Amino acid sequence: LEQFVATGDSEVPAYLTVFGLRTPDADGRLNEDKTLVEIGCGIGRMTCAFTCEYGTVVACDLDAGFLERCIETVGQFGKVDRLRTSHVIDGHTLDLPPDSADVTFSYITLQHCTPDDALELAAEAVRVVRPGGKVALNFRGPATSDVVVVPAGRLVRSTFRIPTVGDWL
């Protein structure tokens, strides 16, 4: 798990820098004063690093089990006092008020959704971000490797629910 989180620890600063999300706003607000919504947090690979950058991180996922693991992961490797979670029960609606976040972020998540759900989540990302906020969403198209990667991903995710394997991961 530590090595898995370390990949997020190295990627998050790079993405935040590339997307201009590490600089103060025009009003001088720093990230530690802002709220980031992460769509598709999984077990918290990137969430840990986000909690070290932002004052509040709302980790959203379709899988309630992943949200539980995300809390555990951030408890070990991030700042859990900055973490909130939100269950995306229907797969496309964020249970968050409009204009409630400074940044919405999603990476390697939307390709796992149906096209309609991905578009609705993109609209939700815009809905929850404040005027002047930023939306950073990653869309990945299908690839030939998906024949192997998609079933392997399902298998790995299913092992998170097996206590002896899930705890080991």
What are these regions (language model features)?
Residues 1-33, 43-93, 113-120, 134-169:
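Class I (Rossmann-like) S-adenosyl-L-methionine-dependent methyltransferase catalytic domain
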Residues 38:
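Class I SAM-dependent methyltransferase core
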Residues 92-104:
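A short acidic, Gly/Pro-enriched loop at the edge of an enzyme's catalytic core
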Residues 119-131:
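A short glycine-rich, Lys/Arg-flanked "PGG" loop and its adjoining helix->strand segment in the class I
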Residues 103-116:
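A short SAM/SAH-binding and catalytic strip from SAM-dependent methyltransferases
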